[in-house]
Curated annotation (Swiss-Prot):
Keyword Aminoacyl-tRNA synthetase: no
Name of the protein in its database record: Cytochrome c oxidase subunit 5A, mitochondrial
Family designation: Belongs to the cytochrome c oxidase subunit 5A family.
Coarse class of the protein's main subcellular location: mitochondrion
Tagged with keyword Iron: yes
Gene Ontology molecular functions: metal ion binding
Assembly notes: Component of the cytochrome c oxidase (complex IV, CIV), a multisubunit enzyme composed of 14 subunits. The complex is composed of a catalytic core of 3 subunits MT-CO1, MT-CO2 and MT-CO3, encoded in the mitochondrial DNA, and 11 supernumerary subunits COX4I, COX5A, COX5B, COX6A, COX6B, COX6C, COX7A, COX7B, COX7C, COX8 and NDUFA4, which are encoded in the nuclear genome.
An annotated GO cellular component: mitochondrial inner membrane
Subcellular location(s) of the protein: Mitochondrion inner membrane
Species of the source: Canis lupus familiaris (Dog)
Pathway connected to this protein: Energy metabolism; oxidative phosphorylation
């Protein structure tokens, strides 16, 4: 989503 580094949770 946002600035995911690995997956796409909330990072």
């Amino acid at each position: 989503s946002h600035g995911s580094h690995e997956t796409d949770e909330e990072f």
